Amino acid sequence: MVELLAPAGNLPMVEAVVRGGADAIYVGPRGWSRRRDRYELTDEDVREAIGIAHERGVKLRVAINTNMQSHEIPAMVEKMERFVGWGVDGAIMTDIGAIAEVHRRFPHLTIHASIGANILNDEDVRFYRSIGVRQVVADTKLTLKELASRKEQIDVGIEILIHANKCYTYLGKCWMSPYHRLERTTDPFGKDLFKGSPNRGGLDYRVCLEAWELYSGETRWEEAVALKNDAFFLLEDIPHLIDLGVHCLKVQGREYPVALVEDMVRFYRDLIDAYLRHPEGRPFDLTPWGAHLARIEAERNVARSDGTRLLLIEARQPVPAS
């Protein structure tokens, strides 16, 4: 049975996606995931979220998917000890050293390789499998044929983003935001936070969506150039992904309004269930679902545009003197 994995950037969103029909939820501990702190949870919030999810038969995973320096590993392990003690169902991670250490200390914990790991080929998957990963998030650029080949050849769960964005580079490997603006702070526990780098506990300013001017020497060739960073919803591919045997369909959106995320999750819950109920061998009509998704997409586009506008304003501010 395919799993529907939903985001939660706060406790009300945990409640909302449970109502929406999520099979599993992921949250980010403050300072350790690829979002700004307002969309992350304190440790006590994580504990409460685990309780809310488990009470309703829903799994909860923590995204600890930043890259780490050596001095941060002990604090991460201490945090994971708490989460495991509270019954967390899995960890979503990127840093290979951190993955290996978590697997060594908690061998029964399911570890998922984050989209930030930027896994592109079968050898990448085999490597992550060798250090303890049991499920990988497929890059958004992979085709259905490539996914089918990977699933057949490697004993690992496949996770697909059904609402996310397609970066003009590769998710997890873009340095444009921190190159443009990088502000370093340290939290009370010694965790480094680099505002401007989602890979280091900060945020992505989305400066690729700024209105750039294109020059060749002194000649301006084009103005108001926006690099490709499109958000998307999958619809037509959902039946094919289910038939392929993909293990998990993942919705991104911890930064969106709670009501919008609940609508997104409920839409996909209803779509998945309807497809699983329909008679095998008969065509599945996606037409009625398109209009519903168009409404959700319009609301998402407004929320994303507002968020991007505020991020770009922030990106233009000077970094405070240290």
Residue ranges and their predicted role:
Residues 132-133:
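As written
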Residues 121-123:
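Conserved nucleotide-cofactor-binding alpha/beta core module
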Residues 139-141:
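Output/docking surface of receiver
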Residues 1-117, 145-250, 254-322:
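Active-site pocket-lining/capping segments in soluble small-molecule metabolic enzymes
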